Amino acid sequence: VFWVMRLGNGKAIARARRPAPNPMAYLGRFFAQPRLISGWTFAVMRSTGWYVFVVFLPIWAVKAGLGDKIGGLSMSLASALMFTTPLMLRWMQARSVRRAVRAGFLGAAVTFALATLLADAPWLALASLMAGALFLLLLDICGGLPFLMAVKPSERTEMAAVYSSYRDVSGIVSPALAWLVLLAAPLSGVFAAAGLLFGGCWVLAGRLHPRLGVARVTARGAVVVKE
């Protein structure tokens, strides 16, 4: 089929009718909409949380005397927790995006901060961080929805490119945050700093619409999702 389409008489490739969209031209529109900024911030903090978990948990495990295999086992267990995401999705759909996002950030904030307080009991601290991975997975499910549901349909292509910049920003913010924390605190302090950022996002998520993402039935029986 591929060769027929490429070598046949049909037009497999057509000339573009207009210039390619320029995401930079939409930065002004992005900064003018607080809902987009909040949604993008949620994505950055979620990615930062995974960076802290994946990079610093194995290092901390070795320094805490848990051995050099615990880090790898923790990553494997965190990956296995992805099988719980269908249950998380069902839980979220029965409530609202706002409630799910706030629950994710609050749970991550508490568990990461608790891991710092339990640093002298490494196994308990590790269990707290693994619980934090569950909340990060919940944010993987719902954390991007506030941004995507706030974007106008006519701007989705350009704003998708703006949204994807969260990966690059978190890749800069995460090591910079760790560097600042390690100047004045032990390695476990990185988890506390991440928990503090999650707490800030929990407060910010309180400004989302209470019924964001909640399905409602119209007079004609149609199901509409609140944006």
Regions flagged by a language model, labelled:
Residues R35-S74:
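Helix-loop boundary and gating motifs at the non-cytosolic
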Residues R156-L183:
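A late C-terminal transmembrane helix in Major Facilitator Superfamily
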